[in-house]
């Protein structure tokens, strides 16, 4: 253990580090929105994340139809994920997500903010006692380019967020490269 670099320690992250552990997909159950006010979900920890995307049919290399540009992040823990995070005391999932999008992406929430209409799904992790709310925010391709640029100036850029990426949504000639390869990349 190195006290100079922080390697192999948790520091102030110790209380929530288990939320970042990869678990089996059988650990998650989908929760209907109307059940979120009931136990065990209501008293569970909460997290909100968002897929920011733009429809895009401009061919890549003149061959592959990308269908959409979807932003993801390289997180501080080495995993790829969507922007978002834990819901703090006194916040609801939408307020927390807009805060996280501002911190992590420098998103101008006066132009683009997550609302109830952005809601997609909630899953509950049995082992973590964590509700995971997922939202989708559609923007134009030009707006997505601006969001990518602004992300470099985000408060959390370089610490909590190490960069943004777009996932490829096409499959190349060998039937493997492109989206299938992306899906096999360990997160």
Swiss-Prot record:
UniProt xrefs under Pfam families: Nudt16-like
* Record-listed Mn(2+) 4 binding positions: 160
- Swiss-Prot/TrEMBL keywords: Cytoplasm, Hydrolase, Magnesium, Manganese, Metal-binding, Nucleotide metabolism, Nucleotide-binding, Nucleus, RNA-binding
Which segments cross the bilayer? none
As recorded in UniProt, its EC number(s) are 3.6.1.62, 3.6.1.64
- Name the protein family: Belongs to the Nudix hydrolase family. NUDT16 subfamily.
Q: What is this protein called?
A: U8 snoRNA-decapping enzyme
């Amino acid at each position: 253990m190195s006290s100079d670099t922080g390697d192999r320690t948790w520091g102030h992250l110790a209380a929530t580090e288990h939320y970042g552990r990869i678990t089996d997909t059988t650990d998650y159950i989908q929760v209907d929105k109307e059940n979120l006010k009931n136990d065990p979900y209501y008293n569970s920890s909460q997290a909100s994340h968002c897929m920011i995307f733009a429809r895009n049919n401009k061919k890549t290399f003149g061959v592959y139809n990308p269908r959409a540009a979807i932003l993801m992040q390289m997180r501080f823990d080495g995993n790829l994920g969507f922007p978002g995070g834990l819901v703090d005391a006194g916040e609801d999932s939408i307020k927390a997500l807009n805060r996280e999008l501002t911190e992590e992406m420098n998103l101008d929430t006066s132009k683009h903010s997550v609302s109830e209409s952005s809601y997609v799904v909630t899953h509950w992790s049995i082992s973590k006692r964590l509700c995971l709310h997922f939202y989708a925010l559609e923007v134009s391709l030009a707006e997505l380019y601006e969001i990518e640029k602004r992300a470099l100036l985000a408060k959390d850029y370089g610490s909590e967020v190490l960069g943004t990426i777009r996932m490829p949504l096409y499959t190349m000639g060998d039937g493997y490269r492109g989206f299938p390869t992306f899906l096999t990349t360990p997160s």
